[in-house]
Amino acid sequence: MKKHISLVLLILFLSASSLFAQEGFHLLTTMSGDSIGDQFSVVSHIGDINADGFDDVIVGAPGGDYAKLFFGGAVFDTIPDLIFKDYKQLNCYFGCAITGDGDINGDGYPDIIIGASDTWIGPSFPFEIMTTGAAYVYFGGPMIDTTADLTLIVGDWLTQTGWYYEFGSSVAIPGDLNGDGYDDFVIGAANDDYDAHGRVYIYYGGPNVDDQYDVLLEGEDVFDNFGFSLSAVGDMNNDGFDDVLIGAPMFHNNIPNKIYQGGKAYLVYGGNEINLTNSIEFTGDTSSYQYGRFISGLGDVNGDSINDLGIMGGEYFKIISGYDFYPVLTVYADTNKFGSYYNIAAANDINNDVYNDIFVGMQEAINNEAFNSIFVYYGGVTIDSIPDLEITQEANSFFQSAGFLGNINNDDYIDYILGAQDWYGGVTPGASRVNIYFFGLPDDVQEDINSIYLSNFILYQNYPNPFNSTTIIKYSIPKQEQVTLKIYDQLGRLVTTLVDVEKNVGQHQVEFHTDKLASGVYFYQLIAGNIILTNKLILLK
């Protein structure tokens, strides 16, 4: 049975003043996209892909058509171990959706699925079917590589099917839907053909899993966008089959002229036969819009031993009890501030009180700028509408996704990854970034950090990154050592030496400031004794 739920949400930075003031999230590291427009911010919980005992991290960058996999370790670094791409096609939006933490071929290792919703198929331009989409399956294990084990495409040039499907725009591994002992996987094509009623394709896992879908579910009406969102939820009705939650945010609720889309979500039950007849429907309020755009299986948030659901519309969200499918909480945004909600995700049990918790993203418009926050609602027997934590963001930074990582460095703290897109002037996407946090009390956190400092050489990701003129580079050494820290360009030419002196045990930092260098990628290298560590930094002017 699935224990971990794929998460979809958006986040960026915690302010430095709140980072260590109380029990809360503490920044472990920051990672950024390679270039402006990469949208490096799509994340998902994937588990221990390479079976080395550490949970791993994956981040998609659909604007740059890549996804980076970072193996966990006692010292987590920000140099990717594998980079996934579709090397045959550019601008295919590879990395727009990612899922993992399910073993679809039964080899004992969790697998990864990556969507590329804008993939074209056909002989060559202009004889191609536009944005039919694709999804790629990579089997986990110690020998995982960047060659897809399965390539999934449902469009066909000869029959001229697949126009505008955007297959792969949503992906999920919801568990064992048909009860055969293997995890199954689900791919959405919400914009299918010309009418956008939406489709969801279900593939049954197994030792001989292939690229042919086993079940096709379709939206009820035109423009429903059925399959826009997908989420694993576990076995909601305790019948031995896992289930799946599907969003149709443009469902029109019988509103005249179909102008205002109330939206809908479907809890589709697994079983020997899977169809929409055997499902529970959650219909949005006719006074609002796009209910089901963001959905999440939340785990058990109220302590009744039954998994619960989160379903969000543009101006409100509901926490749905898995016991009777009635809302246990409904919260509306402040429309006077042009407020709207922008994602919901499971957070597992952040504060260790045995109740699962909830991430909620919200944005408001203030003085012609968009501001984002992430709210944390602690689970409990009763849950009220007042968030327990609020994390505010920089202007024009928009939450993209969030994930429960597990423990990527075995430091006794659960880690979380939170990604966001930067938008310049509200219209141009930036390189974007993700932060990895762990949660705890300041004294406990500092004690654990000190123990890490005293046992490892560590070169941290510079902050901020990308940067304009000035950035901070931190490093720690476990013994007194002669240290050099140098900056190089992409050709390996020395730019400057920041440190060349003997340093004592502990954490150190240095400021790198430049007004003369051109925008681009540079490298900083730490040498301490026979230890050499290198990281990348990005200068944007």
Task: Give the residues covered by each predicted segment.
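Bacterial N-terminal signal peptides that target proteins for export
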Residues: 1-8
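C-terminal outer-membrane/trafficking sorting elements
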Residues: 450-463, 467-541
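Residues in and immediately flanking transmembrane alpha helices
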Residues: 15-16, 256, 478
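Bacterial N-terminal signal peptides
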Residues: 8-17
